[in-house]
Amino acid sequence: MHTRFQAIWSDLSPQLQQALTPYLEQDEFPAMFTAEQVNALKTQLQCNDDELALALLPVAAACAVTPISHFNVGAIARGESGHFYFGANMEFAGAPLQQTVHAEQSAVTHAWLRGESRLVAITVNYTPCGHCRQFMNELNSGTHIAIHLPGRKVATLGDYLPDSFGPKDLNITTLLMDKVNHGYQIDNTSQLAQQALQAINRSHAPYSHSHSGIAVQMKSGKIFQGSYAENAAFNPSMPPLQAALIALNMAGENVMDIESAILIEKADSLLTQWDATQATLTALGCRQIQRVTL
């Protein structure tokens, strides 16, 4: 079992401990449950989707990286597929607070990077901040996505974000989590570069058209992708590096163990991710950083 779960293990009920042990004891627990696993857990615990997601919040929150606030937030994104995806907040010492990732952003991005096509609900242990409400407004689920909180009645994103400003106000029809492939190609055939290529081809940038993607390789040799996810309100956009950091953290890797990275973006883009990416990776101890332009 990953050490991060050991700290909260005694806080879980004996029944939940027994149900989760076969999964969390896996060396590479992916911080998600498939629909089949969700159904098995519900049967064993005699609960429904909502109750299971709420029970899993402490486990998701244990994935938080909070060297600044020491305030752990967990989230569960529930896909139309029936899969459950963990999310947790992340902070990076030595980098600006603007690089912080919120738990809801983490869960949504985790689901997106794993190929989920639509979300039906987000369960989180604290009320979503305005930043996260706006971030979720970019989803193809729209304002109908359900928001679940401990001790609260279920509400929709529309309830939390009335009179919202979103993609439709800018006549954007391709939304976050819609399947896209921008068709970019590069000559670099290395595995890391090709993973970054996959990431940029999945990126969501309908406002600036400044597509970008990154791949990071860990000291363990594992590679993780991150795709840029733009937002109608601009500021809540998810940089590609943060998306990759979410992916590696959910997989149980340490953000300080990144060995190398390749960022791909368009040479003529209105925006660049390079400076912020380089600065944050440097703060995390990574020195082998390459930029490829299209």
Swiss-Prot record:
Reaction(s) catalysed (UniProt annotation): cytidine + H2O + H(+) = uridine + NH4(+); 2'-deoxycytidine + H2O + H(+) = 2'-deoxyuridine + NH4(+)
Listed cofactors: Zn(2+)
Keywords linked to the UniProt accession: Hydrolase, Metal-binding, Zinc
Broad class of enzyme this protein falls into: hydrolase
Coiled coil ranges: none
Molecular-function GO term, any one: zinc ion binding
Residue ranges of domain CMP/dCMP-type deaminase in the record: 48-168, 187-294
Binding site for Zn(2+): 102, 129, 132
Gene Ontology biological process: cytidine deamination
Gene Ontology cellular-component annotations: cytosol
InterPro entries, alphabetized: APOBEC/CMP_deaminase_Zn-bd (IPR016192), CMP_dCMP_dom (IPR002125), Cyd/dCyd_deaminase_Zn-bd (IPR013171), Cyt/Deoxycyt_deaminase (IPR050202), Cyt_deam_dimer (IPR006263), Cytidine_deaminase-like (IPR016193), Cytidine_deaminase_bacteria (IPR020797)
Keyword Ubl conjugation: no
Binding, substrate: 89-91
Record-linked Pfam families: dCMP_cyt_deam_1, dCMP_cyt_deam_2
Source superkingdom: Bacteria
EC assignment: 3.5.4.5
Keyword Zinc: yes
Free-text comment on the cofactor: Binds 1 zinc ion.
Record: active site: 104 (proton donor)
Family: Belongs to the cytidine and deoxycytidylate deaminase family.
Function: This enzyme scavenges exogenous and endogenous cytidine and 2'-deoxycytidine for UMP synthesis.
Record text on subunit structure and interactions: Homodimer.
The name this protein goes by in its record: Cytidine deaminase
Protein's organism: Proteus mirabilis (strain HI4320)
Gene name in the database record: cdd
